[in-house]
Amino acid sequence: MNQLPRVGLGTDVHPIEPGRPCWLVGLLFPSADGCAGHSDGDVAVHALCDAVLSAAGLGDIGEVFGVDDPRWQGVSGADMLRHVVVLITQHGYRVGNAVVQVIGNRPKIGWRRLEAQAVLSRLLNAPVSVSATTTDGLGLTGRGEGLAAIATALVVSLR
């Protein structure tokens, strides 16, 4: 029996940590401060992981990459996405497409958007669209205290 495609939603928010490398949308932004976190702090990749996992009915990033699990300490977003793809494949799914939007003032990602889309698409083996917005000075992202991201993903059955 053919299963209908499934859609998942993911969000992530991290505070900025001065002096920490800035990984965002799978890319290093050397001139910006990165986000604090158990892994590399890439809010966009973390939101994508959550979206894909939830679409496949496999929980969320906290269940898979728990902060109390030393195996995932400092892990790259790329490795996280690769692991998520393995998990959903084992459960009979593949990613159809995904969208991720970064919410924050810095770093500006527009000039690297196509590069980010290529990197993330390669990691998920599916088209990924990347966009960004600000909150017009409101909240922790508007004050430059943190970054956020929201993502959606569509998964389809392999069976």
Swiss-Prot record:
UniProt keywords (A-Z) are:
Isoprene biosynthesis, Lyase, Metal-binding
> Coiled coil located at which positions?
none
Question: Where does this protein hold 4-CDP-2-C-methyl-D-erythritol 2-phosphate?
Answer: 12-14, 38-39, 60-62, 133-136, 143
**Matching SUPFAM superfamilies, A to Z?**
IpsF-like
Q: EC number(s) per UniProt?
A: 4.6.1.12
Catalysed conversion reaction: 4-CDP-2-C-methyl-D-erythritol 2-phosphate = 2-C-methyl-D-erythritol 2,4-cyclic diphosphate + CMP
Positions of the record's site feature: Transition state stabilizer: 38, 134
* Record-linked Pfam families: YgbB
Instruction: Read off the Gene3D superfamilies from this record.
Output: 2-C-methyl-D-erythritol 2,4-cyclodiphosphate synthase
The note filed under miscellaneous reads:
Was identified as a high-confidence drug target.
Purpose of the protein:
Involved in the biosynthesis of isopentenyl diphosphate (IPP) and dimethylallyl diphosphate (DMAPP), two major building blocks of isoprenoid compounds. Catalyzes the conversion of 4-diphosphocytidyl-2-C-methyl-D-erythritol 2-phosphate (CDP-ME2P) to 2-C-methyl-D-erythritol 2,4-cyclodiphosphate (ME-CPP) with a corresponding release of cytidine 5-monophosphate (CMP).
Q: What is this protein called?
A: 2-C-methyl-D-erythritol 2,4-cyclodiphosphate synthase
Give the species this sequence originates from: Mycobacterium tuberculosis (strain ATCC 25618 / H37Rv)
Q: Taxonomically, what lineage is the organism? A: Bacteria, Bacillati, Actinomycetota, Actinomycetes, Mycobacteriales
